[in-house]
Amino acid sequence: DVDPVEKKLHPDEPISSVLRVRRGFVLADFDPASTPGFDEGRKEGEKALSAFAPEIGEWQERLFAETKGGGQRSLLIVLQGLDSAGKGGIVRHVMSNADPAGIKATAFKAPTEEERQHDFLWRVRKALPGPGQIGVFDRSHYEDVLITKVRKFVPAGEITKRYAIIN
């Protein structure tokens, strides 16, 4: 298997071929500044985005149209990154050709008092996109396990239960 960081993406190849984590992957060996599948600069990236941006609106329209015939599919995009990593900018740029009415974007910050009254996935389930919608999560349900473990907000036994639920 080719290292995904070094692999170049062929135009007919799915992006997952360079982004999927494979057995033996070591996070510490991954360069956080890398751009798997795209080795051009910012201007070239903006051109590439402009070229495929109209497709996003078309696919969104198809997804919504499917619901008129009873379709239940939705799309969830999960962005995970450090604070100020550009997750919001990605959403603005990539979704610029989509209909905002069909986008449900959620940024998961520290849980509110109401959210703490429920199980740790309650707020995630509430934010899932409905049929025909595209959901974008700024951070994921994994963070609710990671942060609570690192900062010792919940007992170790609860962390083990949460791992079992999300895996």
Predicted ranges, named:
Residues D1-N167:
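Glycine-rich phosphate-binding loop of ATP-dependent small-molecule kinases
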